[in-house]
A protein has these predicted regions:
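Cleavable N-terminal signal peptides of Sec/SRP-targeted secreted and luminal proteins
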Residues: 1-20
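Cleaved targeting-peptide boundary
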Residues: 21-25
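Extracellular/luminal segments of secreted precursors and ectodomains of membrane proteins
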Residues: 32-65, 70, 74-86, 95, ...
Length: 270
Protein backbone atom coordinates (compact mmCIF):
# COMPACT_ATOMS: atom_id res chain seq x y z
CA UNK A 1 0.00 0.00 0.00
CA UNK A 2 1.14 3.49 -0.80
CA UNK A 3 2.22 5.61 2.10
CA UNK A 4 0.28 8.81 1.79
CA UNK A 5 3.30 10.86 2.80
CA UNK A 6 5.32 9.33 -0.02
CA UNK A 7 2.59 9.20 -2.60
CA UNK A 8 3.14 12.63 -4.09
CA UNK A 9 2.83 11.06 -7.47
CA UNK A 10 4.73 11.95 -10.58
CA UNK A 11 1.43 13.30 -11.85
CA UNK A 12 2.60 16.40 -10.06
CA UNK A 13 5.84 16.40 -12.00
CA UNK A 14 4.42 16.28 -15.46
CA UNK A 15 5.16 19.84 -16.46
CA UNK A 16 8.78 18.82 -16.53
CA UNK A 17 10.17 21.98 -15.09
CA UNK A 18 12.50 20.68 -12.48
CA UNK A 19 14.91 22.09 -10.00
CA UNK A 20 18.55 21.56 -10.71
CA UNK A 21 20.60 19.27 -8.48
CA UNK A 22 21.66 20.57 -5.08
CA UNK A 23 25.08 21.61 -6.30
CA UNK A 24 23.67 23.77 -9.07
CA UNK A 25 23.22 27.50 -8.88
CA UNK A 26 19.79 28.99 -8.40
CA UNK A 27 19.08 32.51 -9.55
CA UNK A 28 16.18 34.30 -7.90
CA UNK A 29 14.49 36.73 -10.22
CA UNK A 30 13.94 40.24 -8.95
CA UNK A 31 10.65 42.01 -9.45
CA UNK A 32 12.24 44.01 -12.26
CA UNK A 33 13.36 40.84 -14.00
CA UNK A 34 9.88 39.45 -13.66
CA UNK A 35 8.36 42.56 -15.19
CA UNK A 36 10.51 42.13 -18.30
CA UNK A 37 8.79 38.84 -19.05
CA UNK A 38 5.89 39.05 -21.46
CA UNK A 39 2.50 38.01 -20.17
CA UNK A 40 -0.53 37.63 -22.38
CA UNK A 41 -2.61 35.46 -24.64
CA UNK A 42 -0.86 33.05 -26.99
CA UNK A 43 2.44 33.37 -25.15
CA UNK A 44 4.30 30.74 -23.14
CA UNK A 45 6.18 31.27 -19.88
CA UNK A 46 8.34 28.19 -20.49
CA UNK A 47 8.70 25.90 -23.47
CA UNK A 48 10.63 22.78 -24.47
CA UNK A 49 12.85 20.48 -22.42
CA UNK A 50 16.33 21.65 -21.44
CA UNK A 51 17.62 18.41 -19.95
CA UNK A 52 17.07 15.83 -17.24
CA UNK A 53 18.03 15.56 -13.60
CA UNK A 54 20.06 12.67 -12.28
CA UNK A 55 16.81 10.99 -11.23
CA UNK A 56 15.50 11.18 -14.79
CA UNK A 57 12.96 13.94 -14.29
CA UNK A 58 12.99 16.20 -17.32
CA UNK A 59 13.22 19.96 -16.90
CA UNK A 60 11.84 22.82 -18.97
CA UNK A 61 13.52 25.85 -20.42
CA UNK A 62 12.60 29.05 -18.57
CA UNK A 63 12.27 31.26 -21.63
CA UNK A 64 9.08 32.89 -22.83
CA UNK A 65 8.03 32.35 -26.43
CA UNK A 66 4.94 32.55 -28.62
CA UNK A 67 2.59 29.58 -28.47
CA UNK A 68 2.87 27.16 -31.38
CA UNK A 69 0.38 25.46 -33.66
CA UNK A 70 0.56 21.66 -33.28
CA UNK A 71 0.08 19.26 -36.15
CA UNK A 72 -3.26 17.47 -36.36
CA UNK A 73 -2.00 14.29 -34.69
CA UNK A 74 -0.56 16.08 -31.66
CA UNK A 75 -3.64 18.28 -31.41
CA UNK A 76 -5.86 15.19 -31.30
CA UNK A 77 -3.63 13.58 -28.65
CA UNK A 78 -3.82 16.66 -26.47
CA UNK A 79 -7.58 16.99 -26.90
CA UNK A 80 -8.07 13.40 -25.75
CA UNK A 81 -6.60 14.24 -22.34
CA UNK A 82 -7.04 18.00 -22.18
CA UNK A 83 -10.27 19.06 -23.91
CA UNK A 84 -9.84 22.64 -22.68
CA UNK A 85 -6.67 23.01 -24.79
CA UNK A 86 -7.43 23.83 -28.41
CA UNK A 87 -5.59 25.71 -31.12
CA UNK A 88 -2.04 26.73 -30.24
CA UNK A 89 -0.14 25.12 -27.37
CA UNK A 90 2.79 25.74 -25.02
CA UNK A 91 4.15 22.18 -24.85
CA UNK A 92 6.15 19.97 -27.18
CA UNK A 93 5.04 16.44 -27.98
CA UNK A 94 7.69 15.09 -25.60
CA UNK A 95 6.36 17.27 -22.80
CA UNK A 96 2.80 16.19 -23.47
CA UNK A 97 3.78 12.52 -23.56
CA UNK A 98 5.41 12.99 -20.15
CA UNK A 99 2.25 14.62 -18.83
CA UNK A 100 0.03 11.87 -20.17
CA UNK A 101 2.19 9.06 -18.79
CA UNK A 102 2.40 10.59 -15.34
CA UNK A 103 -1.23 11.64 -14.82
CA UNK A 104 -2.19 8.03 -15.51
CA UNK A 105 -1.00 7.34 -11.97
CA UNK A 106 -3.81 9.49 -10.54
CA UNK A 107 -6.63 7.90 -12.51
CA UNK A 108 -7.09 4.78 -10.34
CA UNK A 109 -7.56 7.01 -7.30
CA UNK A 110 -9.97 9.53 -8.83
CA UNK A 111 -11.77 7.61 -11.58
CA UNK A 112 -14.74 6.93 -9.30
CA UNK A 113 -15.79 10.54 -9.76
CA UNK A 114 -15.42 11.82 -13.34
CA UNK A 115 -15.98 15.45 -12.27
CA UNK A 116 -13.12 15.29 -9.77
CA UNK A 117 -10.80 13.66 -12.29
CA UNK A 118 -11.69 16.20 -14.98
CA UNK A 119 -10.97 19.12 -12.65
CA UNK A 120 -7.71 17.53 -11.50
CA UNK A 121 -6.52 16.93 -15.06
CA UNK A 122 -7.48 20.47 -16.09
CA UNK A 123 -5.28 21.86 -13.32
CA UNK A 124 -2.23 20.22 -14.88
CA UNK A 125 -3.27 20.45 -18.53
CA UNK A 126 -3.53 24.22 -18.26
CA UNK A 127 -0.17 24.46 -16.51
CA UNK A 128 1.52 22.26 -19.08
CA UNK A 129 0.05 23.17 -22.43
CA UNK A 130 -2.27 26.18 -22.32
CA UNK A 131 -1.49 28.64 -25.14
CA UNK A 132 -2.09 31.42 -22.60
CA UNK A 133 0.36 29.95 -20.09
CA UNK A 134 2.17 33.23 -19.44
CA UNK A 135 -1.04 34.84 -18.20
CA UNK A 136 -1.02 32.68 -15.08
CA UNK A 137 2.51 31.28 -14.84
CA UNK A 138 5.47 33.35 -13.66
CA UNK A 139 8.97 31.89 -13.51
CA UNK A 140 10.41 33.02 -10.17
CA UNK A 141 13.81 31.30 -10.16
CA UNK A 142 16.19 29.79 -12.69
CA UNK A 143 18.50 26.88 -11.92
CA UNK A 144 21.60 25.82 -13.80
CA UNK A 145 21.67 22.16 -14.81
CA UNK A 146 24.77 21.07 -16.74
CA UNK A 147 25.28 24.64 -17.93
CA UNK A 148 21.70 24.89 -19.14
CA UNK A 149 19.19 27.29 -17.63
CA UNK A 150 16.08 25.54 -16.34
CA UNK A 151 13.00 26.61 -14.46
CA UNK A 152 13.66 26.39 -10.74
CA UNK A 153 10.33 27.58 -9.35
CA UNK A 154 7.13 29.19 -10.51
CA UNK A 155 4.10 31.07 -9.32
CA UNK A 156 0.88 29.50 -10.60
CA UNK A 157 -2.04 31.92 -10.37
CA UNK A 158 -5.42 30.23 -9.93
CA UNK A 159 -8.74 31.63 -8.76
CA UNK A 160 -9.87 30.58 -5.31
CA UNK A 161 -13.15 29.55 -6.94
CA UNK A 162 -11.41 26.94 -9.09
CA UNK A 163 -9.36 25.68 -6.16
CA UNK A 164 -12.43 25.38 -3.96
CA UNK A 165 -14.43 23.61 -6.67
CA UNK A 166 -11.58 21.19 -7.35
CA UNK A 167 -11.29 20.26 -3.69
CA UNK A 168 -15.03 19.99 -3.12
CA UNK A 169 -15.40 17.67 -6.12
CA UNK A 170 -12.64 15.36 -4.86
CA UNK A 171 -12.75 15.44 -1.07
CA UNK A 172 -15.14 12.49 -0.64
CA UNK A 173 -13.94 10.32 -3.53
CA UNK A 174 -13.19 6.80 -2.32
CA UNK A 175 -10.38 4.54 -3.44
CA UNK A 176 -10.63 0.79 -3.79
CA UNK A 177 -12.12 -1.82 -1.53
CA UNK A 178 -10.65 -0.18 1.57
CA UNK A 179 -13.10 2.69 1.12
CA UNK A 180 -10.31 5.14 1.96
CA UNK A 181 -10.59 8.68 0.69
CA UNK A 182 -8.48 9.30 -2.42
CA UNK A 183 -7.34 12.64 -1.01
CA UNK A 184 -5.30 10.70 1.57
CA UNK A 185 -3.18 9.35 -1.29
CA UNK A 186 -3.07 12.24 -3.75
CA UNK A 187 -3.22 15.06 -1.21
CA UNK A 188 -1.82 13.77 2.09
CA UNK A 189 -5.26 14.14 3.65
CA UNK A 190 -5.62 17.85 2.85
CA UNK A 191 -8.56 19.52 4.58
CA UNK A 192 -9.02 22.31 2.03
CA UNK A 193 -7.71 23.36 -1.37
CA UNK A 194 -4.95 25.51 0.08
CA UNK A 195 -3.51 22.53 1.95
CA UNK A 196 -3.80 20.44 -1.21
CA UNK A 197 -2.06 23.06 -3.32
CA UNK A 198 0.70 23.38 -0.72
CA UNK A 199 1.23 19.62 -0.95
CA UNK A 200 1.24 19.63 -4.74
CA UNK A 201 3.70 22.52 -4.88
CA UNK A 202 6.21 21.08 -2.45
CA UNK A 203 9.62 20.37 -3.95
CA UNK A 204 10.73 16.75 -3.68
CA UNK A 205 14.30 15.64 -3.14
CA UNK A 206 15.98 13.75 -6.00
CA UNK A 207 14.78 10.16 -6.43
CA UNK A 208 11.67 10.74 -4.32
CA UNK A 209 8.14 11.06 -5.69
CA UNK A 210 6.90 14.59 -6.00
CA UNK A 211 7.46 17.82 -7.80
CA UNK A 212 11.08 18.49 -8.84
CA UNK A 213 10.45 22.23 -8.59
CA UNK A 214 8.52 24.50 -6.27
CA UNK A 215 5.04 25.62 -7.32
CA UNK A 216 3.67 28.56 -5.39
CA UNK A 217 -0.09 28.70 -5.92
CA UNK A 218 -1.46 32.23 -5.78
CA UNK A 219 -4.63 34.10 -6.70
CA UNK A 220 -3.37 37.69 -6.64
CA UNK A 221 -2.32 38.05 -10.29
CA UNK A 222 -1.00 41.45 -11.37
CA UNK A 223 -3.40 42.40 -14.14
CA UNK A 224 -1.42 45.57 -14.88
CA UNK A 225 1.27 43.42 -16.56
CA UNK A 226 -1.17 41.20 -18.44
CA UNK A 227 -1.59 38.42 -15.90
CA UNK A 228 -4.82 36.86 -14.67
CA UNK A 229 -5.50 33.71 -12.67
CA UNK A 230 -6.36 30.46 -14.39
CA UNK A 231 -10.09 29.84 -14.15
CA UNK A 232 -11.25 27.11 -16.52
CA UNK A 233 -14.64 25.61 -15.82
CA UNK A 234 -14.67 23.44 -12.72
CA UNK A 235 -17.34 20.77 -12.40
CA UNK A 236 -19.33 19.91 -9.31
CA UNK A 237 -19.30 16.24 -8.34
CA UNK A 238 -23.08 16.46 -8.63
CA UNK A 239 -22.90 17.58 -12.26
CA UNK A 240 -25.21 15.34 -14.26
CA UNK A 241 -22.85 15.23 -17.27
CA UNK A 242 -19.97 13.97 -15.12
CA UNK A 243 -21.93 12.20 -12.47
CA UNK A 244 -20.27 10.59 -9.48
CA UNK A 245 -21.66 7.88 -7.23
CA UNK A 246 -23.32 8.92 -4.00
CA UNK A 247 -20.45 7.33 -2.10
CA UNK A 248 -18.04 9.68 -3.88
CA UNK A 249 -20.37 12.68 -3.84
CA UNK A 250 -22.82 12.57 -0.92
CA UNK A 251 -23.58 16.28 -1.41
CA UNK A 252 -25.13 15.70 -4.86
CA UNK A 253 -28.83 16.64 -5.03
CA UNK A 254 -29.79 13.09 -6.06
CA UNK A 255 -27.99 11.78 -2.99
CA UNK A 256 -29.77 13.93 -0.43
CA UNK A 257 -31.71 12.22 2.34
CA UNK A 258 -35.01 13.21 0.74
CA UNK A 259 -34.16 11.61 -2.61
CA UNK A 260 -34.26 7.98 -1.45
CA UNK A 261 -37.43 8.62 0.57
CA UNK A 262 -39.13 10.07 -2.49
CA UNK A 263 -37.96 7.09 -4.54
CA UNK A 264 -39.31 4.61 -1.98
CA UNK A 265 -42.67 6.40 -1.85
CA UNK A 266 -42.96 6.00 -5.62
CA UNK A 267 -42.12 2.30 -5.34
CA UNK A 268 -44.64 1.70 -2.56
CA UNK A 269 -47.34 3.60 -4.43
CA UNK A 270 -47.12 1.29 -7.43
Amino acid sequence: MYNMHHSHFNILLFVSIGNAERSDTRILLTSNATLREKHGEDYCAMYDICGARSDGKVVNCPFGSPSVKPDDLLSAKIQSLCPTISGNICCTEAQFDTLRAQVQQAIPFLVGCPACLRNFLNLFCELSCSPHQSQFINVTSISKLKNNSTVGSIDYYITDAFGESLFESCKEVKFGTMNSRAIEFVGAGAKNFREWFAFIGRKASPDLPGSPYAINFRSDADESIGMKPMNVTAYSCGDTSLGCSCGDCPSAPVCSSSAPQHFMKRILAQ
